[in-house]
Amino acid sequence: MSDPAADRDILKAKLNQETAKANWKELQPFFARGQTVYVAPELDLIEVALAFSEDQADILSLWRDKGQVDKVADAQAGQWFEADQALWTVVVMPWVLVQPVQVQ
């Protein structure tokens, strides 16, 4: 019998290892297919990826209602293209979750 908490920790570690930086221009094919999902900077990208993986509809709906998680809009994509925006990315098939890299 598997331990749900241990399974979640393993999935979280896997998602963390699969997180990478990419420039927006590299992600254009995914955007063109409607597969890029914006994650607001105040959210933890890995926690959002876990919510997608575990189909946590309630929390995803809450974030969507707050504008914190949503498909990347055309206007945002244009701004990121012009700025050659760097983004943190993680794939949760079929989605590519993206979060702007914060300059400190």
For the regions a language model picked out, list residue spans one by one.
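N-terminal, charge-rich interaction modules
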Residues: M1-S53
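Alpha-helix boundary recognition
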Residues: F31, R64, F81-E82
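Generic structural motif recognizing short loop/turn segments at the entrances and edges of beta-strands
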Residues: A32-T36, D44-I46, Q56-D58, Q85-W88, ...
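Generic secondary-structure microfeatures
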Residues: P41-L43, R64-Q68, P94-V96
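Short, hydrophobic/π-rich interface segment
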Residues: E47-Q76
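Short, compact, well-ordered microdomains
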Residues: D70-Q104
